[in-house]
Amino acid sequence: TIRKQGAVPATIAIIGGVMKVGLSKEEIELLGREGHNVTKVSRRDLPFVVAAGKNGATTVASTMIIAALAGIKVFATGGIGGVHRGAEHTFDISADLQELANTNVTVVCAGAKSILDLGLTTEYLETFGVPLIGYQTKALPAFFCRTSSFDVSIRLDSASEIARAMAVKWQSGLNGGLVVANPIPEQFAMPEESINAAIDQAVAEAEEQGVIGKESTPFLLARVAELTGGDSLKSNIQL
């Protein structure tokens, strides 16, 4: 378990306008019951959801903000947001990337969500000086898949190596986060061909239906789950 490894599990969310680090079972169940009625909260939305006393599900960006306020230097999530496909026309780029460029928190994940443009996402991270570390891998994990056709910026093979890099970065005044990409366990990974076909279809449907902005990711993930007969959701849960 997480505790046996020396860490403390603490789910981050906004409950009744309070930024919370560590939720009770009842609070987690509340968010589950409320479902899509819970506001998706990124940096832009955070003050308004808190001021209105609402419940909020935090993105990577707002989770980083709350973690930093609480003195937490590392957290885990399924996958970071990034540059959406077609962003050269829409400018649809997740606020997660700017938060990673500015906030001193390390995000451990299974790479960027594979519904995104992984190539442009890696380029964006490079431009803003965000290290993209592959944990025991040189290939960038792609959320549902263990590999992709893109590389991480550096491979590190132990937690101690990563911790030393974090310390040196921040002690040197190099503000901003780090991404640690840890591939999904092999037994839960999906074949690239099948998941990419489902993603391509979901992206096309989103364009046809005019789904844009913060609604894009929930729509695409839900549609990919439908197109894969629930297999992608099973993989997502394992992340």
Model-predicted segments: where are they?
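Glycine-rich nucleotide/cofactor/substrate-binding loop typically near the N-terminus or early
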Residues: T1-V50, Q171-Q187, E192-I195
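Solvent-exposed alpha-helices and their adjacent loops that cap or buttress functional pockets
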Residues: K4, V41, I65-L69, V74-A76, ...
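General beta-strand structural signal in soluble alpha/beta enzymes
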Residues: P9-I14, V50, G56, V74-G79, ...
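Glycine-rich beta-alpha junction loops
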Residues: G16-V18, G81, G111, Q136-P141, ...
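Active-site glycine-rich loop that binds ribose-phosphate moieties when present
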Residues: A57-V60, E88-A101, V105-E126, A159-R164
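Anionic-ligand binding region
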Residues: C145-Q171
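A C-terminal functional module that forms or caps the active site or interfaces directly
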Residues: G176-Q238
